[in-house]
Amino acid sequence: TELAGENRVFSTILRGAGAYAHYIPSIVKYIPAKEEFLTAYTPYQAELSQGILQSIFEYQTMICELTGMDVSNASVYDGAPAAAAAAAMCRDRKRRVTLISGAAHPDVINTVRTYCYGTGDELRVIPAKDGKTDPDALRALLAAGDVSGVCIQQPNFFGQLEDAEALGEIIHAAGALYILSCNPIALGILKTPKECGADIAVGEGQPLGMPLGWGGPYLGFMAATSKHMRKLPGRIVGQTVDSHGERCFVLSLQAREQHIRREKASSNICSNEALCALTAGVYLSAMGPEGLAEAARQSMAKAHYLARGLAAIEGVTLRYSGEFFHEFVTDLPKQDEILAALEQADILGGLPLEGGILWCATEKVPREALDRTIAIVKEVLSK
């Protein structure tokens, strides 16, 4: 209790950078807490695990609908390992170089770099220009013909919306595979990764019903075209019929997994992610397509409202002029003073960057809090 009392709970959160304070329907925390689901058991024995297997199958189905892909796995630990595992899926004997956008989340870049080091592959970072992936730099890096896969984040770390379709065309023209790391809430209104030409779709699933809490537990979603199905890591639940002709669920393509291939398996994901996948499935079911789109629209509208208000203050400028979803960067002085003043007002301000602040707004932020934030920034800068 004493340690918990040291936690600071803000009434308004204007910080994102990979972890987002979205509305979570009340039902989301109750269903995963049922004793039928709350278990560390891995559902290897299908005849004893139909409920858990069905919940994972439904999660996979919803991820495929969200991304437009053909097949999804039962998730991995979080978004950064998902991107790294996707890079491993792209590897072949002749192409041992992976590219990742310099506008991707720094933690994702570092995680992919760690995985590449372990496999002896090389990671090269595509320079960013005006807050987005530089297409000319991408072409130059692809010219050598040694790139196996390219990872682009949409929206990127700075909140900017990449021209995902055009980048995909450049990548495929060079014979490389296209990994699109995307925000699942943004997919409520943006084109799907499949429509953008991606071969593999990954992302951080935390916005899908998982609360903020010291970085976890989260989940990383992964989906791919059927051509790459056998390279997906972790468990895949499939639907079939039993000896009586009744529908049932089983673990499919198990020869890929660690309990059979051991050290040759593509991952060692075990039971922990089933509960997070169930949480995401319940969230998506509760919100529905319309609810998810509404959350995305409100988040985008409130972020743009905040951006306009801040940009109208003398001394504050938007760092990038491109379109953004629900995050943006402002250049401004007195960062520490601004964030301290916001904290005094029970508002967690944006993430401090060099010379600026990365702001985020979700559907949970009331307009009054946005107006108050704008007023506080204006007051601090007027002194």
Spell out what each predicted region is:
Residues 44-48, 64-84:
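Short loop-beta-helix segment that forms the pyridoxal 5′-phosphate
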Residues 208-314, 318-321:
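Active-site C-terminal subdomain of aminotransferase-like
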